[in-house]
Swiss-Prot record:
Purpose of the protein: One of the early assembly proteins it binds 23S rRNA. One of the proteins that surrounds the polypeptide exit tunnel on the outside of the ribosome. Forms the main docking site for trigger factor binding to the ribosome.
Keyword Ribosomal protein annotated: yes
Name the UniProt record assigns to this protein: Large ribosomal subunit protein uL23
GO biological process terms, semicolon-separated: translation
Organism: Staphylococcus epidermidis (strain ATCC 35984 / DSM 28319 / BCRC 17069 / CCUG 31568 / BM 3577 / RP62A)
GO cellular component: ribonucleoprotein complex; ribosome
Amino acid sequence: MEARDVLKRPVITEKSSEAMAEDKYTFDVDTRANKTQVKIAVEEIFDVKVDSVNIINYKPKKKRMGRYQGYTNKRRKAIVKLKEGSIDLFN
């Protein structure tokens, strides 16, 4: 899997914005990607050094639209902590 396939999009929420002050950045990643692939992708794309990677899996939720029932997509989110002295990603 290539680096551009691993990272889907950055997650910009109030909670993730507060974590940016601690050099923690949040990304939606491919559901098949592991911590090592996420680390390599962030280092390759943004040219920074990664300290640690934490991954959170979200299960699909059951949703209804009238009489039709289905599920939302499952997601995988990665929280990447950069080493001190690295530059800001989104500034």
